[in-house]
Curated annotation (Swiss-Prot):
The lineage of its organism: Eukaryota, Metazoa, Cnidaria, Anthozoa, Hexacorallia. Transmembrane segments: none annotated. It comes from the Eukaryota. Expressed in tentacles and mesenteric filaments. Pore-forming protein that forms cations-selective hydrophilic pores of around 1 nm and causes cardiac stimulation and cytolysis. Pore formation is a multi-step process that involves specific recognition of membrane sphingomyelin (but neither cholesterol nor phosphatidylcholine) using aromatic rich region and adjacent phosphocholine (POC) binding site, firm binding to the membrane (mainly driven by hydrophobic interactions) accompanied by the transfer of the N-terminal region to the lipid-water interface and finally pore formation after oligomerization of monomers. PANTHER family: BRYOPORIN (PTHR40388:SF1). Keywords: Cytolysis, Ion transport, Membrane, Nematocyst, Secreted, Target cell membrane, Target membrane, Toxin, Transmembrane, Transport. This is DELTA-stichotoxin-She4b. It is found in: Secreted; Nematocyst; Target cell membrane. Composed of a long N-terminal alpha-helix and a core region rich in beta-sheet structures. Before the pore formation, the alpha-helix binds the lipid membrane, partitions into the lipid-water interface and stabilizes the monomeric molecule on the membrane. Finally, it traverses the bilayer, thus forming the transmembrane pore. Residues 1-10 are annotated as: Plays an important role in the hemolytic activity. Octamer or nonamer in membranes. Monomer in the soluble state. Originally described as forming tetramer in the presence of a lipidic interface.
Length: 175
């Protein structure tokens, strides 16, 4: 299994994320997430909060500098109208928290794929509040395009999310 593991940051590719998607099987709404830590510090997993859907893996506990975490989410099993919508948090050795949100909706007539990343001051676990802050803040559409922003605290983000129901999201956090 790839999801729930750590790999060398330089080896984080869409091909790796394709393998993570394959592991999830025939599910109509799913996502493979890869986040490369080039921040200069180590990250420690806090938790994941699923607004909709679930995961079959545990967040990798430690993500050293120059390594990338692999994670995944999927809709609930069975004929249910849910997507894969979540926020998760990592405590950074700088004393702040990296919050990440993704949304792969069930109904594309009304919704689109969305994602965002933010650094929170101090230690903060992912919850409904973090999800809402990221989802209703200024998120990026999963539009198959690269996006960049300054995260503050001397860090930058560059990332992409695909628009499909079997989504891939790749993010790099760097100085």
């Amino acid at each position: 299994a790839l999801a729930g593991t750590i790999i060398a940051g330089a080896s984080l590719t869409f091909q790796v994320l394709d393998k993570v998607l394959e592991e999830l099987g025939k599910v109509s709404r799913k996502i493979a997430v890869g986040i490369d830590n080039e921040s200069g510090g180590t990250w420690t997993a806090l938790n994941a909060y699923f607004r909709s859907g679930t995961t079959d893996v545990i967040l990798p506990e430690f993500v050293p500098n120059t390594k990338a975490l692999l994670y995944s989410g999927r809709k609930d099993t069975g004929p249910v109208a849910t997507g894969a919508v979540a926020a998760f948090a990592y405590y950074m050795s700088s004393g702040n928290t990296l919050g990440v949100m993704f949304s792969v909706p069930f109904d594309y007539n009304w919704y689109s794929n969305w994602w965002d990343v933010k650094i929170y001051s101090g230690k903060r676990r992912a919850d409904q509040g973090m999800y809402e802050d990221l989802y209703y803040g200024n998120p990026y559409r999963g539009d198959n395009g690269w996006h960049e922003k300054n995260l503050g605290y001397g860090l930058r983000m560059k990332g992409i999310m695909t628009s499909a129901g079997e989504a891939k999201m790749q993010i790099k956090i760097s100085r």
